[in-house]
Structure formats: structure tokens, C-alpha cells
Amino acid sequence: MAKQEDQFKNVISHAKEYGYVFQSSEIYDGLSAVYDYAQNGVELKKNLRDYWWKAMVQMHDNIVGLDASIFMHPTTWKASGHVDAFNDPLIDNKDSKKRYRADVLIEDYVAKYDDKIEKEVKKAAKRFGDAFDKVQFLETNPRVLGYKAKGADILARMGKSLEQEDLADVKSLIEELGIACPLSGSKNWTDVKQFNLMFGTKLGASAEHATDLYLRPETAQGIFVNFLNVQKTGRMKIPFGIAQTGKAFRNEIVARQFIFRQREFEQMEMQFFVRPGTQKEWYETWKTSRLKWHISLGLGVDNYRFHDHDKLAHYADA
């Protein structure tokens, strides 16, 4: 873990030193989780975006592009569920005054079981040498199976509590696991509360007559509200796709990991519309297709794996 953190720090240092990424407004002490792409970074991002656009749009007859605006009618976000469901469960430590995502605290705790499993694997590999079968070991070793079961039980309980909006049980789980504040070591927690991730703003010349708006938290809704327009004017027949790239904004309270978790970021997204009942088939087709595209970037096959989420977005079923 320490080695990975050192490597991550080296990447950040390299990105700044060689003109790829700068801290935004750095001369004024910067702004947390907001970054500027520098002279080399902007070219790298443009090349990647152009390559994605060519592969996703220009090489498919049944996929077209779109450039929707950042501002949308506020009813859009009510209808999509973002106003009511686009939330993070947050918890404060009373002693450090630090705020955390409750689910991340629990997931970080479960990750310790993965570290323990890795230690068991290393010990066994050293003990058995060339005869060591890692797959069989992971499937049969009692300690490993015990760690897996504990982690799975914790995540299952958390997932059920969040799904049922039982935030009291999420706090109870944190207390039962003895999770402490990473900063202070204190276990003195507040209740868990939901926090909406959308940035709000106003449209209008005066405050009393202004309309509440949001900076879009994703590009997908611009595609959905233009579905009929694109279908009619482009004479598109299902199955077909609509793609776009553009800025999105999320008021991340726990923003970390450099450019991998920002409050302002760019998305490259394609929504593919299919007939009901065929979504699983198309899902697998696109999983295979997109993996080939990622591998074509030359970063190595071993650096990619599919991760099936236990906790899905409020609008997803896979």
C-alpha cells in the first residue's frame, strides 16, 4: 500500500514538472480537487478524445454525436431522479471536524481484508514455491475464505442499509466495526446524512425572480432529452447510439486522488438505445468492444479488469 502511495505521488509530481497538470489558481493557494490541464496535458487529452470520437462515432453508421448545453431545465434533474437520489451518505467526526463518506469508510475497512488475503497468498507462495496454485489457494484456504466472507457480509449489510435509506444502521455498522477517524483516531461520530452532489445556481436578473438551475452532474441527460429530436431528424432506427463529450460538475465533499476524482471534469459518453429484452446481450457486446479499445491504448492487458458493482446507480440495473 505504501509503495502504491509513493508511486502515486511520483505521478503527480511528474505531471506538474513536465507540464501536464497544474493545480487550479495555484498562485492563490489553489482550489481543492480542481485542476488545469497544462500545455502537454491538453494535447494528450485532445488526442485521447479525438481517438475515442473516431472509434465510437465516426466508425459506426448507427451512432451520431451531440453537444448539449451544460444548463438544462431544472425539471430534467427532478425527472431523472438526481434531485432526490443523487446523494452521498456523509458522516462527521466530532473531534477532528472532518467529514467523510460513510460508505467509503466502510469500504476502506473491508479493503484491509484484501490486504490480509494478499499476505496469505505471499506466505503460501513462498512456502510452496513453483508448486503453488494461486487460484486453488484462493478458493480453498480457510483463512482466505473467512476474510472474503467477512468482507462480503459487511458490504451486503451496507448495501441493504443504503438501499433502504436506513442511515442509522450505516452509523451502527461503522461503530460496530470500530472504524476511527483517519485523521484523529477518534470514534466520536455524528449521524449519517445524505448530501446532494449537484451544484446549484440561479438564472435571472434579480434574486426574487430567479430560477433555480444546476450545473449538470453528467452528460447523459442531454442525450436523453434529445432522443426524439435525433431519432426524427437523423431517421435513426433502434438500435442506435448518441455520443457526446463535455464538462460535468459534482460537489464532491470527499474529493481526492488527484485528477481521478474532481469537482469539474470531462466525460466521454455514448448512450446506446435497444429494444426491451435485448439489453443484456448488448451490454456484453459493448463490454467486449470497449475493452478492445482500452487495450489498443497500449497500457497492457493486465491493467484492465471488469468490476461488477454491488451498489448500482439509482438508474442502473447492470
What are these language model-derived features?
Residues 2-318:
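TRNA-recognition modules of translation machinery and tRNA-sensing kinases, especially anticodon-binding
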